Amino acid sequence: MKDMRICFIGDSFVNGTGDEKMLGWAGRLCAEARQHGHDTTYYNLGIRRNTSTDILQRWSEVSLRQQPDCDNRIVLSCGVNDTTMENGAMRVDFETSLQNMRDLFARMQSSPGLVVGPPPVDDELQNQRIQTLSNAMQSEAKKAGLPFISLFDHLIQDSNYLAEIAQNDGAHPRSTGYDKIARLISDSGKWWF
């Protein structure tokens, strides 16, 4: 069996910001895979405040970690920062964000990939923008033949998750929230293990 190398690229939610265990959902998923005997190496390429534009510009970070003799995988998750308002406008307008997603999805075709949609935050208006973007991402991922997991649809209905982010910084969960995200991904039937 080849060594599996998984690049998780995205924003602060990929990074695990707010998690007291410093694992985030990516670390939890790979720790569980390792416990079940899967030889995995994971690279957390999550950066706080990164938008889809930022991620597209640094895509070479993924390529640097992929090796021809390995089973290379890619997990992309972003979107919340695109929908954040700054100076009266979204950080990345909707059409640019969608085009960035198409470009990112095209780059993911080199390896088995998975797209994890953005989670809700403690801001009703931003959640409307996140939901719109998440739905569009799901549609584009389907066109690209990539599995998509909607965190928003599940977590917006979870009062405990929403309370946790409200008590933290209004966006990021703590360990319990990252446990939930990891479980949603693991139980989706789209995660590889």
Identify the function of each model-found stretch:
Residues A31, H38, Q57-F193:
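Alpha-helical cap/lid subdomain in secreted, periplasmic
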Residues M1-R48, T53, S60-C70:
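Serine-esterase "nucleophile elbow" of acetyl-processing enzymes
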